């Protein structure tokens, strides 16, 4: 399966039991900031934004004072799982980022998708990739 198929079929799909509800944008990005696959709607990000995200995984709490920035959008960092998951909130939407051995799995959502639904979709794929040694 191609990386794009993982994004299309496992991240940008309808939320289980909620037809028509899906993430706004999603991507799989290598730890080095290289995009493996992304939805057409995933924001163009700056290298320093990705560096900040990677630093927060290695030093949990790094982004809390300044917020998480991606594609020029600022998210307030909310409780995640140190070294494994970063979660951010902006208005009625937000972002979930799951770290695997080699990649970061991103999910961005807006109203109609709940934070819990985004977490479930992103973390399920991230956990699967971890099980595969990725």
Swiss-Prot record:
InterPro entries: PFN, PFN_euk, PFN_sf, Profilin_CS. Keywords: Actin-binding, Allergen, Cytoplasm, Cytoskeleton, Disulfide bond, Phosphoprotein. The modification Phosphothreonine is found at residue 114. GO terms for cellular component: cell cortex; cytoskeleton. A motif (Involved in PIP2 interaction) lies at residues 84-100. It is found in: Cytoplasm, Cytoskeleton. SUPFAM superfamilies: Profilin (actin-binding protein). Phosphorylated by MAP kinases. Disulfide bonds join 13-118. GO terms for molecular function: actin monomer binding. Its main location: cytoplasm. Occurs in many kinds of cells as a complex with monomeric actin in a 1:1 ratio. The variability of the residues taking part of IgE-binding epitopes might be responsible of the difference in cross-reactivity among olive pollen cultivars, and between distantly related pollen species, leading to a variable range of allergy reactions among atopic patients. Belongs to the profilin family. Binds to actin and affects the structure of the cytoskeleton. At high concentrations, profilin prevents the polymerization of actin, whereas it enhances it at low concentrations. This is Profilin-1.
């Amino acid at each position: 399966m191609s990386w794009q198929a993982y994004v299309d079929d496992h991240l940008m799909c309808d939320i289980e039991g909620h037809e028509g509800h899906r993430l706004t944008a999603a991507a799989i990005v290598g730890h080095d900031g290289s995009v493996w696959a992304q939805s057409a709607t995933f924001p163009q990000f700056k290298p320093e934004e990705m560096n900040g995200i990677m630093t927060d995984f290695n030093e949990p709490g790094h982004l809390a004072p300044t917020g998480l920035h991606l594609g020029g959008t600022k998210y307030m960092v909310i409780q995640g799982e140190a070294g494994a998951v970063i979660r951010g909130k902006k208005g009625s939407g937000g972002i979930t980022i799951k770290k695997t051995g080699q990649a970061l799995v991103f999910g961005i959502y807006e109203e109609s998708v709940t934070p819990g639904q985004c977490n479930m979709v992103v973390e399920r794929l991230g956990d699967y990739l971890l099980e595969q040694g990725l």
